[in-house]
């Protein structure tokens, strides 16, 4: 398949963001550079209130549907979304797609102490060589400390990585990438992928395939981590249906659109 031209790519407008209407295979074949963000319901709610997060989305080269629920609701639009591409499973697809590419060098940034290193070990064992060239678990609140952020930039640069996965939660990971991307010229692909490092390390289990297939992975995760996720899924994310209903009725207004 020929590389897709950005100006020829189809986009689906959901609330105030444009989502690339792309399949997993198309993304694998065309993700050569840029920032990848993966909107889900939680992101879409934050994007109604957080201008900095919204600006990051506008500057990101790849905006891909992460949510099965968003994918299903997208069927109500004139041009439905082709495929939901959960970031956690996409990353596995990405390194397996590039497993024979000696030029693909990945750095993992995120998760709790020791987990990123464990993920690095497992991935390298799976692909049979040192594809992941570095891993680091930053301190809690690291993004508020410029000296630590600059040290992280130095570590990534010295690793020789050209792919950086940041998994410290949204919107922190997306904002951090956009703030520091220009200081890491060797990195061509930036991925903001939440709990992916934990999944790769085996410290967090993905939902069984049947739960994923029917769009209920979010419920499975909530059952596993109710204290952390109940409010997000059953209170905060419910706002999406209000906003999406307004879009279907043609009365939704982008809170950040210039007058």
Q: What are these regions, as identified by a protein language model?
A:
Residues 1-92:
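N-terminal nucleotide/polyanion-binding subdomain common to many enzyme families
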Residues 120, 174-183:
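Short Gly/Thr/Asp-enriched flexible loops that form oxyanion-binding sites at enzyme active sites
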Residues 33, 102-104, 185-189:
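A short helix->loop->beta-strand "cap" motif at the edges of active sites that frequently abuts
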Residues 69-76, 206-259:
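A transmembrane-helix-recognition feature enriched in membrane-embedded lipid enzymes
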Residues 156-165, 169-170:
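Proline-aspartate-enriched helix->loop->beta-strand connector
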Residues 77-159:
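Conserved beta-alpha
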Residues 70-72, 172, 196-201:
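Short gly/pro/ser/thr-enriched loop/turn and capping motifs at secondary-structure boundaries
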Residues 138-143, 186-224:
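Short, flexible loop segments at boundaries between secondary-structure elements
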């Amino acid at each position: 398949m020929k590389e897709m031209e950005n100006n020829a790519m189809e986009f689906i407008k959901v609330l105030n963001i444009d989502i690339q209407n792309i399949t997993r295979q198309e993304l694998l074949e065309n993700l050569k550079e840029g920032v990848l963000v993966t909107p889900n319901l939680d992101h879409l709610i934050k994007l109604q209130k957080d201008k900095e997060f919204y600006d990051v989305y506008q500057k990101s080269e790849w905006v891909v549907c992460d949510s099965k629920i968003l994918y299903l609701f997208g069927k109500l639009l004139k041009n439905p979304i082709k495929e939901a591409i959960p970031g956690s499973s996409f990353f596995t697809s990405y390194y397996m797609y590039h497993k024979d590419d000696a030029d693909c060098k990945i750095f993992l940034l995120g998760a709790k102490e020791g987990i990123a290193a464990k993920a690095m070990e497992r991935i390298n064992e799976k692909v049979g060589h040192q594809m992941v060239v570095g891993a680091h678990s930053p301190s809690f609140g690291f993004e508020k400390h410029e000296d630590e952020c600059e040290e992280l930039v130095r570590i990534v640069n010295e690793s020789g990585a050209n792919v950086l996965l940041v998994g410290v939660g949204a919107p922190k990971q997306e904002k951090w990438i956009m703030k520091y991307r220009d200081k890491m010229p060797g990195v061509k692909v930036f991925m903001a992928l939440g709990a992916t490092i934990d999944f790769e390390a085996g410290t967090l289990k993905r939902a069984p395939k049947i739960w994923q297939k029917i769009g209920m992975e979010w419920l499975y995760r909530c059952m596993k981590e109710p204290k952390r996720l109940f409010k997000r899924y059953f209170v905060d994310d419910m706002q999406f249906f209000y906003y999406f209903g307004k879009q279907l009725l043609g009365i939704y207004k982008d809170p950040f659109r210039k007058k």
